[in-house]
């Protein structure tokens, strides 16, 4: 992964990501997709489904198409400085991006619990917008399926891209009976891996990961099952992670809350408090196992 040294002063773009999980014989697994190599955001890297908030995400009739009142969604994010509608839009964006990028539809019918995700995907390909698909199929989005996990704010020195995002990460169990798959447009490959296996493949040079994915996978690796992740997420406030990069001896270092160089002294995530850029990738100074200490 190439290092970006550009300073970016453009406003933050609100975004949302869904970390989809499942229980497998080997334990907890997470869904990752490979961004198209020509993408202007993390091209070639493996990421969780997600993207920026669109205007339509906040324009939807939330009382009709969401399964929870906005006040509960707002409370779940624990962000006093945003409106309830903005909070609702973040949930909608997360669910929309999950569907558009992986084909997984977190929804239920108004009159039945059954949904036809294949038909919904067909309508989307035919040019119907996400909100129109919900209306046409009489679907209500299942915001209860999402639990806020963390909030990542890109610094003005992004290190791996030239855009800045204010991204809310949600965790969720993939719905039973649905198959997550890359869209062959924005993403070109997809895989289910245990968090540790994903990091092992990254360490071996088999896949590329950006720092937020590295740190998130290291966090998830501490859990053995989906219920453990969801329970932990429900039992705490989603931490705000604003990385603070600096250069040390000609080497780019990204530090996180709790690091001696970070402005926030309290550690927000388990694992290392800094990653250093070596061999065209970011890694902890103490080696691979430091991700799990």
Pin down the residues of each PLM region.
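N-terminal leader/linker segments that precede catalytic domains of diphosphate-processing enzymes
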Residues: 1-293
């Amino acid at each position: 992964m190439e290092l970006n040294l550009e300073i970016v002063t453009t406003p933050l773009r609100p975004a949302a990501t869904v970390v989809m999980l499942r229980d497998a014989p080997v334990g907890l697994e997470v869904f990752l997709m490979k961004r198209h190599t020509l993408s202007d955001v993390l091209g070639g890297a493996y990421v969780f489904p997600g993207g920026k908030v669109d205007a339509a995400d906040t324009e939807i009739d939330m009382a009709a198409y969401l399964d929870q009142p906005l006040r509960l969604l707002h409370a779940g994010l624990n962000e006093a400085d945003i409106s309830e509608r903005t909070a609702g839009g973040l949930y909608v964006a997360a669910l929309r991006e999950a569907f558009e990028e992986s084909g997984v539809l977190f929804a239920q019918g108004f009159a039945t619990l059954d949904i036809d995700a294949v038909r919904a995907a067909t309508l989307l390909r035919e040019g119907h917008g996400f909100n129109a698909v919900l209306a046409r199929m009489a679907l209500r989005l299942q915001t209860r399926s999402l639990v806020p996990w963390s909030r990542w704010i890109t610094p003005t020195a992004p290190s791996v891209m030239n855009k800045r995002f204010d991204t809310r990460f949600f965790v969720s169990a993939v719905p039973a009976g649905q198959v997550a798959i890359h869209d062959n447009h924005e993403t070109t490959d997809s895989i289910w891996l245990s968090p540790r296996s994903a990091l092992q493949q990254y360490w071996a040079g088999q896949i590329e990961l950006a720092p937020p994915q590295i740190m998130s996978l290291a966090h998830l690796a501490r859990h053995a099952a989906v219920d453990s992740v969801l329970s932990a997420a429900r039992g705490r406030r989603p931490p705000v992670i604003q990385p603070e990069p600096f250069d040390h001896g000609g080497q780019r270092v990204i530090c996180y809350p709790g690091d001696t160089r970070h402005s926030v002294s309290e550690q927000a995530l388990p694992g290392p408090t800094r990653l250093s850029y070596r061999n065209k990738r970011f890694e902890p100074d103490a080696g691979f196992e430091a991700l799990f200490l």
